[in-house]
Amino acid sequence: MPNETNVNIGNAGEYFVAGELERRGFTVAVPMSNVKDFDILAIDRETHKQIAIQVKTTGYKQKKWTLSKKNENLIGDDIFYIFVSLNELDTPEYHIVPSKIVANTIKESHNKWLETPGKKGQKHNNTNIRVFLDNEDLFFDK
């Protein structure tokens, strides 16, 4: 079970994203309880296009987010991840990534990690943990 600080950081990220989407012309619904696979549902007020959003948040000035193996299979044309860096007291940063790119990236990087020897030359054990990095700001929303 996640600790209270992580839950608060996650909730803050979801509400920052919801506010930003509203500001950009979307009508947003944030479910009151956990919904499998999605944190936010949004509808473009002009086109009426609907999208589902998975929000992942870090409270630090880093561009690394933890996911799980199940995220390798969460793929759809209308599914997006918004990775949030709360940056402590600075303005949050948003990295917007289509689900297909996230799924492929975390699968490839995990397989590469498994093939790379550990610090002492040992083989890595397979886990359900996956990591998404955007150190080069390829998906940074300016």
Residue ranges and their predicted role:
Residues 1-36, 41-142:
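Mixed-charge (Asp/Glu-Lys/Arg
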